[in-house]
From Swiss-Prot:
Enzyme category, top tier: ligase
Similarity-based family: Belongs to the class-II aminoacyl-tRNA synthetase family. Phe-tRNA synthetase alpha subunit type 2 subfamily.
Cofactor: Mg(2+)
Cellular compartment(s): Cytoplasm
EC numbers, comma separated: 6.1.1.20
The entry's keywords: Aminoacyl-tRNA synthetase, ATP-binding, Cytoplasm, Ligase, Magnesium, Metal-binding, Nucleotide-binding, Protein biosynthesis
Classification via PANTHER family: PHENYLALANINE--TRNA LIGASE ALPHA SUBUNIT (PTHR11538:SF40), PHENYLALANYL-TRNA SYNTHETASE (PTHR11538)
The organism's taxonomic lineage, starting at the top: Archaea, Thermoproteota, Thermoprotei, Sulfolobales, Sulfolobaceae
Domain of life of the source: Archaea
GO cellular component terms, A-Z: cytoplasm
Subunit structure: Tetramer of two alpha and two beta subunits.
UniProt-recorded name of the protein: Phenylalanine--tRNA ligase alpha subunit
Species: Sulfurisphaera tokodaii (strain DSM 16993 / JCM 10545 / NBRC 100140 / 7)
Length: 469
């Protein structure tokens, strides 16, 4: 079956037998690019032979067009001299920017000579006839003249592809292709005059590279949606934090190893905290519980937060009225060697529930709801120790192909923390590393792929967090 343009080209070649692609394009009013592609199709169908040639073409530059219109500089110089000697400054004033070019080419062609500051003509008249003819018809020009014009940047040389197309097989019967089969064509029988296009029902639809979210960003948004659906409100805080919220309010002693330089990023300068009552309560609780002299200056040091629990600590410090259910998703920063499983900045999800009579059993049920929502149906809990919760558990989820994998840490907030913020209700908290969770759920072996920028890779990535899996 032949398309409309294929038929046009074959009918034209039936008369001409042979023609260039450029000629076909002009005569049939078909874009030259379409002629190239249609020629390839007709060649594959055995109707034509295609011979490709490369030819050199010359084009006038803007300067070349100016010379054709205004004349060559050396012509102007000879005309100004009019067979008489003249001073250089006088000619320079009249010729302007063309003066240097005119002197150079006039000397090279033997039209003038220079004596001190005087230009002496050697000819009375001069016309650059050969150069002008070469600009008009460069293909027939003398090689030396042509090279001169190229050197003077009056012409540019281009290599063009020319297709010569020759008919080798006449089509037995040419029927135009029918794109739309209408009821009228069926009723009248007109459809028989056309070739019906065959359809490949197994062919894939065309691919359109439309914009899409980065797959890890989409993963984070799905987690946010899940937490909101479970009745949690999202809270935020800055990356730069004071140690008070990152450690002290969470009953982490000032000599704890996690506060050393190799486990957190320090920032020069000090922060501020105006809640003197809260500062004094934290001081008393630390000195009573850990038996050391608590230093407020240490707690005011700036750092890049090492855990998003610093955000929920700020919620606690605001002394909220129960019931409250909040979560935060954000970046945290810890010194480490970057490899397939470690980064120095990564994402965490922290949650906090404050309710009257909230029990450890309620906490485990909440965690099970969250992980079921992510798509992890089998959950186990293992007793653990964390500085700011008691009792505490580690959460393990069963991942296909990997078995039981640690997913999160959780527990009821220690009474020392609740005492510091004057909250009498029970509170449960948990935190999980989102980047490693994403690696497990998305089947990645390198954590760095979560931040990939390769367009093809991102285009083909999919995100599936399905509670029904």
């Amino acid at each position: 079956m032949l398309s409309e343009n294929e038929i046009k080209i074959l009918e034209y070649l039936s008369k001409k037998r042979e023609a260039s692609a450029e000629d076909i394009s002009k005569q049939l009013n078909i874009p030259i690019e379409s002629v190239f592609s249609i020629s390839q199709l007709l060649k594959e169908k055995g109707y034509i032979e295609v011979e490709e040639k490369k030819v050199i073409k010359y084009e006038l530059t803007d300067e070349g067009k100016r010379r054709l219109k205004e004349g060559f500089p050396e012509e102007k110089l000879v005309k100004l001299l009019d067979g008489k000697e003249k001073k250089i400054h006088e000619l320079k004033d009249k010729l302007g920017r063309d003066f240097e070019i005119s002197i150079g080419w006039a000397k090279r062609k033997g039209l003038v000579k220079i004596d001190g500051d005087t230009v002496i003509p050697l000819v009375k008249d001069y016309e650059a006839k050969e150069e002008k003819e070469a600009l008009i018809n460069p293909e027939k020009a003398n090689k030396d003249i042509l090279q001169q014009l190229l050197n003077r940047k009056l012409l540019i040389k281009k290599e063009e592809k020319i297709l010569n197309i020759r008919l080798i097989r006449e089509p037995l019967e040419i029927k135009p292709a029918l794109i739309f089969l209408t009821p009228e064509l069926l009723a009248s029988g007109e459809w028989k005059k056309y070739a019906l296009r065959e359809y490949n029902v197994e062919a894939y639809p065309p691919f359109y590279p439309i914009g899409k979210k980065h797959f890890f960003k989409e993963f984070l948004e799905r987690l946010r949606d899940l937490m909101r659906d479970l009745g949690f409100k999202e809270v935020y805080s800055d990356y730069v934090e004071i140690e008070f919220y990152n450690f002290d309010l969470l009953f982490q002693a000032q000599d704890h190893p996690a506060r050393e330089i190799h486990d957190s990023f320090a920032i020069s300068g000090k922060g501020k905290l105006t809640d003197e009552k809260l500062i004094q309560r934290v001081k008393q609780i630390h000195e009573r519980g850990w038996k050391y002299n608590w230093d407020v200056n240490i707690s005011m040091r700036l750092m890049l937060r090492s855990q998003t629990t610093a955000t929920t600590a700020r919620v606690l410090a605001s002394r909220p009225k129960p019931p409250i259910r909040v979560f935060t998703i954000g970046k945290v920063f810890r010194p480490d060697s970057i490899d397939a499983t470690h980064l120095i900045e990564f994402h965490q999800l922290d949650g906090l529930v404050i309710e009257d009579n909230f029990t450890f059993r309620d906490l485990l049920g909440t965690l099970k709801e969250i992980f079921n929502g992510i798509g992890i149906k089998e959950i186990r809990f293992k007793p653990a120790y964390f500085p700011f919760t008691e009792p505490s558990v580690e959460v393990y989820g069963k991942i296909e192909g990997l078995g039981w994998v640690e997913m999160a840490g959780a527990g009821l907030l220690r009474p020392e923390i609740l005492e510091a913020v004057e909250i009498s209700s029970s509170a449960g908290a948990w935190g999980l590393g989102i980047d490693r969770l994403a690696m497990l759920l998305l089947g990645l072996k390198d954590i760095r792929l979560l931040y990939a920028t390769d367009i093809e890779y991102l285009r083909n990535r999919k995100v599936e967090i399905n509670a029904d899996n």
